[in-house]
Each structure stands twice: as structure tokens, then as C-alpha cells.
Amino acid sequence: LNSKVKKIEKYETNSYKVILESGDVFEAEHVITSMPLASLPSTIYPNENKETKLSGESLKFRDFLSVALVLDVEDAFPDNWIYIHEPGVKVGRVQNYGSWSPYLVKEGKTCLGLEYFVNIGDELWSMEDDKLIDLAINELKKLSLIKTSSTLEGYVVRMPKAYPVYDLDYSKNIDIIEKWLTTEHKNIYPIGRNGMHRYNNQDHSMMTAVLSVRNIILGEKNNVWKVNVEEDYHEEVNSGRS
């Protein structure tokens, strides 16, 4: 865990060496990978297929940061999250962690996560943590969700490559990489949101891993690329609430 892969080297028909930046080498017949799909074609060696590398380099991401504020109130609002459409603020969504589970927060307190959709290196991403916390407090106050005096603590978490971008060339680039993997590297299994460059929720991501393991251990022929191909909006529910 927490190890960066330098190279995945194919040295026999279905045998690989996974070489870490630390210098450690692991030999494997099957490789399950959650590294960004964008990086996979340039990580697998040898790879003379330039088209796959260009497709990988063309895949784009949207980055993300969350400002978590601990409030001295028992419950700010009943929703799990609220999408913000107010043009006067930069926050895109507010999570209420205690509404997901009361065990996520201390008794009598509330923790709200203000989520900002950003790009690495832009103004918000580069802003100092204390200024981001001040911004979040002021925006919650502007939205009439809290009183400034109720804030006890603030934390900032930055998440690169949080969202795969679906641009006009998305399907073409994914198809090129998928075809290459399924024909030349059948024993490499990309999984998860980053690993497949697909807007998978947690359940979808777990399912791609489960199906990959079943393919390896039980010899099944599950196509993980068929997981989550429906076009329904993931957070939509029958009641219309999120």
C-alpha cells in the first residue's frame, strides 16, 4: 500500500513484474490495478502501441477539495448533502456527515464538508488552509446555514483526480485502451473510478474488484467494463431528494 509503481513489465505470455519506485519487484500472473487509467499505457512495458499512450494522455480529470467544519450545534440540517446553485458563492456541495451516520461525529456536534470543484494549481487549490477555512465559514454564513460563532475547528483535504472528465473524445479514448488491454494484457484488471476512468460510485468500484477476483480465482468471464454503463444519474432517488 502507498507505493508508487514505476513499471509493469510483461516478460512472458501471462507473467508480469511490478516494479516500484522503491526498487522492490513483485512477480505476478495477474495484476489488479486502481492506478489512474490515464497512466497505465505508459506504465506497461513493452508497449509499442502509441495510440494507447496518446489516449491515456488525453484523459482528463477534475480535482476536488473539501473544507470540513466542526460546529457546536447538534444538527445543522437533516439532509445528507445539499447542492449549491447560489451564484454568489464558490462552494458546490455541502455534506452533512452526521446525517450519513451519527457515529461519524461527536455527540452534540455537527461536521459539515464544503466541497469545491477545482483544478490542481488554480486559485482555490493553491489557497492556504486557514484562508480556505475562513472562506467556507463565510460562505456557510452567506447561505444562512450556520452562525459564525458556532464553528469550533476546520480542516482541509485536497483530492487530486477525483472526477473523470467525460469530454467529446472520452468514449474513443476509453475504447482504444479497453481493446488493447483485453487483447494484449488479459491478466491486467483495472478497477475502480480512477482505474477505469469512469464515474463509479463506491458500490460500482467494489463490484469491479469483486468481479475481477472471481475471474481470477473461479475462471469466470465477467466483463468489468460493463459495470455501471447505465445512464441514470447516480444520486437521483425516487423522492427527488439527494
How would you label these PLM feature ranges?
Residues 41-42, 164, 198:
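Glycine/Thr-rich phosphate-binding loops of Rossmann-like dinucleotide-binding domains
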Residues 4-130, 134-145, 157, 171, ...:
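Mid-domain catalytic core of redox enzymes
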Residues 168-242:
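C-terminal lid/capping helical subdomain adjacent to the catalytic/cofactor pocket in oxidative enzymes
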Residues 1:
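Conserved active-site beta-strand element of glycosyltransferases/polysaccharide synthases
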